[in-house]
Amino acid sequence: MGSQSSKAPRGDVTAEEAAGASPAKANGQENGHVKSNGDLTPKGEGESPPVNGTDEAAGATGDAIEPAPPSQGAEAKGDAPPKETPKKKKKFSFKKPFKLSGLSFKRNRKEGGGDSSASSPTEEEQEQGEIGACSEEGTAPEGKAAATPESQEPQAKGAEAGAACKGGDTEEEAGPPAEPSTPSGPESGPTPAGAEQNE
């Protein structure tokens, strides 16, 4: 829709005369745009685009140079997929050593709440869980046994559990811890267990 004032509606009347004659266009606007005649200089003289457009072409080449960083960004995007694959590998490698080494039975339960490996742990994980339980059982009752001489049976059980965890014979491991913690020296390992049963 071209401006109606640019068309000469009657004979020799030009757009400038029509704009000057109209009271609505007295502010120098023509169809919503400010008219500029030779007396008025544009606000941004240095930033005004040239009429012939030669500098715009140079600016376009400058713009063509500027897309080079986005092409570097494309290379960065090319680098991004290898970065994504290590992330996938990290997830895979994190789970895989977890299953093989069985680092912590408790941690496996926390982490794999919905995972099938948590509901049915492997043999190694079960062994690790037993060892963890044995070490907890072995340390707590032994500490109590050292404090009170009456709890010698739990100490023996703790020593046996510790021996079972270490894979050694229960008799060898149970004997030495029971002897130093007993108040009376002549008592042997099996005798304190029988004494507690009588109590």
Curated annotation (Swiss-Prot):
Signal peptide bounds: none
Family of the protein in this entry: Belongs to the MARCKS family.
PTM (free text): Phosphorylated. Phosphorylation at Ser-120 and Thr-182 is non-redundantly catalyzed by MAPK8 in vivo. Phosphorylation at Thr-148 is preferentially catalyzed by MAPK8 in vivo, but this modification can also be catalyzed by other kinases in the absence of MAPK8. May be phosphorylated by protein kinase C, which disrupts the interaction with calmodulin.
Region annotated Effector domain involved in lipid-binding and calmodulin-binding, chain positions: 87-110
GO molecular function terms listed in the Swiss-Prot or TrEMBL record: actin filament binding; calmodulin binding
Gene encoding the protein: MARCKSL1
Origin organism lineage: Eukaryota, Metazoa, Chordata, Craniata, Vertebrata
Compositional bias (Basic and acidic residues): 76-85
Species: Oryctolagus cuniculus
Subcellular localization: Cytoplasm, Cytoskeleton; Cell membrane
GO terms, biological process: actin filament organization; central nervous system development
Induction entry: Up-regulated in alveolar macrophages in response to bacterial lipopolysaccharide (LPS).
PROSITE patterns recorded: MARCKS_1 (PS00826), MARCKS_2 (PS00827)
Name of the protein in its database record: MARCKS-related protein
Subunit structure: Binds to filamentous actin (F-actin), but not to monomeric G-actin, independently of its phosphorylation status. Interacts with calmodulin.
Alphabetical keyword list: Actin-binding, Calmodulin-binding, Cell membrane, Cytoplasm, Cytoskeleton, Lipoprotein, Membrane, Myristate, Phosphoprotein
Residues annotated with Phosphothreonine modification: T14, T85, T148, T170, T182, T191
GO CC, alphabetical: cytoplasm; cytoskeleton; plasma membrane
The keyword DNA-binding is assigned to this record: no
Function: Controls cell movement by regulating actin cytoskeleton homeostasis and filopodium and lamellipodium formation. When unphosphorylated, induces cell migration. When phosphorylated by MAPK8, induces actin bundles formation and stabilization, thereby reducing actin plasticity, hence restricting cell movement, including neuronal migration. May be involved in coupling the protein kinase C and calmodulin signal transduction systems.
Lipid linkage positions (N-myristoyl glycine): G2
